[in-house]
């Protein structure tokens, strides 16, 4: 098997977790239909997979992390913007639906996020490499975030947060 295909297989869970997280913001506000959400999610998954395909290194998860980072900092991440355009969301609508400050790190075996520049970093998805590089040989868990992270998600805070302990779960 070509090395890219085995690498690509490992990013499926990570991309799905990131897309689900972003899509929840659109769903929470209730301004998009279920069909629009599905189209947005599918488009964003495809865009991220294409964007990451030569920058995914399961053997060195931190390599390329900056390239894979999804960032909203008063500017919209271009990949989120492209997916939103496909469902007819304007830039203004998208900025109303998403936090003005969001960083989402999509790395092999872990997806984490921070809302606000001084917010807590919360782990959204975690997997452990268990002897192989495909999804089937990986112990995968969705990580339940602490109440503080859920509050940040629901409120879309942009103000500095209090210091919270970060909880991670590994199998």
From Swiss-Prot:
PROSITE patterns: BTG_1 (PS00960), BTG_2 (PS01203). GO terms for molecular function: enzyme binding. The keyword Phosphoprotein applies. InterPro entries: Anti_prolifrtn, BTG, BTG-like_sf. It comes from the Eukaryota. The modification Phosphoserine is found at residue 159. Keywords: Phosphoprotein. GO terms for biological process: negative regulation of cell population proliferation; positive regulation of angiogenesis; positive regulation of endothelial cell differentiation; positive regulation of fibroblast apoptotic process. One of its GO terms (cellular component) is cytoplasm. PANTHER family: B-CELL TRANSLOCATION GENE, PROTEIN BTG1. Interacts with CNOT7 and CNOT8. Anti-proliferative protein. Belongs to the BTG family. This is Protein BTG1. It comes from Bos taurus. The gene is BTG1.
């Amino acid at each position: 098997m070509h090395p890219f295909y085995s690498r690509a297989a490992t990013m499926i869970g990570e991309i799905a977790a990131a897309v689900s997280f972003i899509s929840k913001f659109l769903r929470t506000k209730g301004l998009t239909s279920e069909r629009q959400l599905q189209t947005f999610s599918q488009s964003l998954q495809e865009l991220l997979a294409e964007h990451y395909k030569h920058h995914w290194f399961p053997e060195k998860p931190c390599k390329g992390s900056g390239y894979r980072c999804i960032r909203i900092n008063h500017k919209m991440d271009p990949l989120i913007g492209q997916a939103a355009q496909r469902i007819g969301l304007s830039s203004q609508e998208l900025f109303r639906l998403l936090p003005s400050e969001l960083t989402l790190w999509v790395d092999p075996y872990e997806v984490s996020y921070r809302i606000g520049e001084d917010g807590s970093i919360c782990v959204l998805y975690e997997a452990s490499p268990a002897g192989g590089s495909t999804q089937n040989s990986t112990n995968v868990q969705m990580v339940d975030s602490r109440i503080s992270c859920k509050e940040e998600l629901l409120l879309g805070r942009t103000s500095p947060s209090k210091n919270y302990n970060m909880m991670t779960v590994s199998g």
